[in-house]
Curated annotation (Swiss-Prot):
InterPro entries: Chaperonin_GroES (IPR020818), Chaperonin_GroES_sf (IPR037124), Chaprnonin_Cpn10_CS (IPR018369), GroES-like_sf (IPR011032). It comes from Buchnera aphidicola subsp. Cinara cedri (strain Cc). It holds the Pfam family Cpn10. This is Co-chaperonin GroES. Heptamer of 7 subunits arranged in a ring. Interacts with the chaperonin GroEL. NCBIfam families: PRK00364.1-1. GO terms for molecular function: ATP binding; metal ion binding; protein folding chaperone; protein-folding chaperone binding; unfolded protein binding. PROSITE patterns: CHAPERONINS_CPN10. Belongs to the GroES chaperonin family. The gene is groES. It is found in: Cytoplasm.
Length: 97
């Protein structure tokens, strides 16, 4: 199955969390937390403005992003892989190399 996001939605695959602290301690359970970084897998066509025009998204497929997993974020499992469906507003930054 393949997802195609609508409008200003973005599909992101969350990066794996580092399971060791900076001091080398292995983190488990809630201490490990969930990553707020991921790679953009798919983007919608853009946000519909009040005048009916469409504003293209700033993020693109392949971007590594930092996101806020807030109220509007939806987690789905597609082909045994967990992905997040976010709006572009949930994305806080694009990580540039």
């Amino acid at each position: 199955m393949k997802l195609r996001p609508l409008h200003d939605r973005v599909i992101v695959k969350r990066n794996e969390v580092e399971l060791k602290s900076a001091g080398g301690i292995v983190l488990t359970g809630s201490a490990a937390g969930k990553s707020t970084r991921g790679v953009v897998l798919s983007v919608g066509k853009g946000r519909i403005l009040d005048n009916g025009s469409i504003k293209k998204l700033d993020v693109k497929v392949g971007d590594i992003v930092i996101f806020n997993e807030g109220y509007g974020a939806k987690t789905e499992t597609i082909n045994n892989e967990e992905v997040l469906i976010l709006t572009e507003n949930d994305i806080l930054a694009i990580v540039e190399k």
